[in-house]
Swiss-Prot record:
Protein name stated in the entry: Cytochrome c oxidase subunit 1
Pfam families the record matches: COX1
InterPro entries: Cyt_c_oxase-like_su1_dom (IPR023616), Cyt_c_oxase-like_su1_sf (IPR036927), Cyt_C_Oxase_1 (IPR000883), Cyt_c_Oxase_su1_BS (IPR023615)
GO function terms (MF aspect): cytochrome-c oxidase activity; heme binding; metal ion binding
Membrane-spanning parts: 1-31, 40-56, 69-97, 106-127, 141-152
GO BP annotations, alphabetical order: electron transport coupled proton transport; mitochondrial electron transport, cytochrome c to oxygen
Cross-link type 1'-histidyl-3'-tyrosine (His-Tyr), residue numbers: 10-14
Residue positions binding Mg(2+): 138-139
Species for this entry: Geophagus steindachneri
Binding site for O2: 14
Length: 152
């Protein structure tokens, strides 16, 4: 039953973040004085990739339930692949800021804080994507920190 729970419940995590990504893109572009974010089409493709990949990585929440090594290897690899489109988004946000005249207002500071915390959460997520490390870090504050950093 755990597979059913995560198979249907996990993709929503990656789908629910998409509007937040859109808001950050608009906020960063506005407060950098740009008309649109850097790499607009790349950002759109990255969001579609993140949404689709969310459907094939559910079992990274289940590394400790006795999956065989081949299954763990697949979910480790598939989970790490999510870092690629996510990195495209973070790079594009930072590239949007580059060369602009950043206005240090509340919404710009919140967007920069989100980008920083989301990046730290992504780095901890890459560590947790490794099934061997995930098993060792299971039920620790490292996992709690990852979850909260990604949620920013």
């Amino acid at each position: 039953y755990e597979h059913l729970f995560w198979f249907f419940g996990h993709p929503e995590v990656y789908i629910l973040i998409l509007p937040g990504f859109g808001m950050i893109s608009h906020i960063v572009a506005y407060y950098a004085g740009k008309k649109e974010p850097f790499g607009c089409m790349g950002m759109i493709w990255a969001m579609m990739a993140i949404g689709l990949l969310g459907f094939i990585v559910w079992a990274h929440h289940m590394f400790t339930v006795g999956m065989d090594v081949d299954t763990r290897a697949y979910f480790t690899s598939a989970t790490m692949v999510i870092a690629i489109p996510t990195g495209v988004k973070v790079f594009s946000w930072l590239a949007t800021l580059h060369g602009g005249s950043l206005k240090w207002e509340t919404x710009x500071x919140x967007a920069l804080g989100f980008i920083f915390l989301f990046t730290v959460g992504g780095l901890t997520g890459i560590v947790l994507a490794n099934s061997s490390l995930d098993i060792m870090l299971h039920d620790t504050y490292y996992v709690v920190a990852h979850f909260h950093y990604v949620l920013s």
